[in-house]
């Protein structure tokens, strides 16, 4: 496919997507879909991707909007009020719950340590195509410092998970089951960030084993966070189910991490 054909295809599916949200969902969902597309293309891809080491940090905002778009879609008949700037802001930000914004912030804070773990051992490939990633520009020490900061922020954010639900009382059992599950899942992921050793021997495929593990765990971590949010929304039994699933995945990963494994290229 030529560059022009790819551009045309991207424009067409973007327009179709926005129109679909406008006709089948509501104006607010269409607005955030439009915002996501324009921010990703103009701010991230055209401006930041090849000019700043903070490219994925700022650009990560576009990738963090799907929960907001989905929540607005599920909310039903939402419309944008343009009578004043205040009315406009209220109409696009007030989705009836803090949870979509909690999930947006979760993805936003997760993005840097997720991608930088990969970039720690793929920085030469990023450099070869002119993408300035943090490890290649600022070095491993600076990258690991910032990754650890984001990991700590994610643990702090986990403490707010029950409050983001909106209908959980801190005296209820579900509040503590869900809250502690979120905290433990975040500590588990944060630990994989803190134990990354850029000086350890690389595998035959060029991986830094601890960085590779953190990268792969980060994907399981994000999925688990969404799973426990969904299960907890179903009540105490759902929160317990989410806790059991999280514990199973964590124990499985810790068990596998202690076993010798064959090197598979990434």
Predicted features and spans:
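Hydrophobic residues within alpha-helical transmembrane segments
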Residues: 1, 8, 12, 35, ...
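Intramembrane alpha-helical segments
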Residues: 3-78
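Cytosolic, membrane-interface loops and tails of multi-pass inner-membrane proteins
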Residues: 1, 116-144, 199-202, 264-266
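Helix-coil boundary and interhelical linker segments in multi-pass alpha-helical membrane proteins
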Residues: 16-31, 66-107, 159-177, 230-238
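Transmembrane alpha-helical segments that form the membrane-embedded catalytic/substrate-channel core
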Residues: 38-45, 104-123, 155, 183-198, ...
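Small-residue-rich transmembrane alpha-helices that serve as helix-helix interface/gating elements
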Residues: 179-186, 219, 237-251
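Multi-pass membrane catalytic core of lipid/isoprenoid biosynthesis enzymes
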Residues: 1-30, 140-167
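Interfacial loop-to-transmembrane junctions
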Residues: 190-227, 231, 261-266
């Amino acid at each position: 496919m030529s560059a022009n054909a790819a551009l045309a295809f991207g424009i067409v599916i973007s327009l179709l997507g926005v129109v679909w949200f406008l006709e089948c969902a509501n104006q607010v969902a269409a607005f955030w879909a439009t915002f996501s597309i324009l921010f990703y293309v103009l701010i991230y891809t055209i401006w930041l991707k090849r000019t700043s080491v903070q490219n994925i940090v700022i650009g990560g905002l576009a990738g963090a909007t799907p929960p907001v778009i989905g929540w607005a879609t599920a909310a039903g008949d939402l419309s944008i009020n343009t009578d004043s700037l205040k009315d406009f802001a209220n109409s696009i930000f007030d989705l009836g719950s803090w949870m979509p914004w909690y999930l947006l912030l979760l993805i936003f804070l997760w993005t840097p340590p997720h991608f930088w773990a990969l970039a720690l051992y793929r920085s030469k490939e990023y450099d070869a195509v002119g993408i300035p990633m943090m490890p290649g520009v600022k070095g491993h020490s600076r990258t690991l410092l910032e990754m650890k900061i984001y990991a700590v922020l994610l643990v702090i954010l986990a403490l707010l998970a029950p409050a983001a639900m909106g209908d959980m009382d801190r005296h209820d059992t579900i509040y503590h089951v869900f809250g502690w599950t979120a905290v433990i899942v975040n500590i588990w992921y944060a630990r994989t960030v803190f134990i990354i050793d850029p000086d350890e021997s690389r595998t035959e495929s060029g991986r830094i084993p601890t960085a590779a593990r953190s990268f792969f765990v980060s994907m399981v971590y994000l999925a688990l966070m969404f799973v426990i949010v969904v299960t907890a929304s179903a009540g105490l039994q759902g929160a317990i189910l989410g806790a059991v699933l999280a514990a199973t995945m964590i124990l499985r990963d810790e068990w596998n991490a202690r076993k010798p494994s064959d090197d598979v290229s990434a």
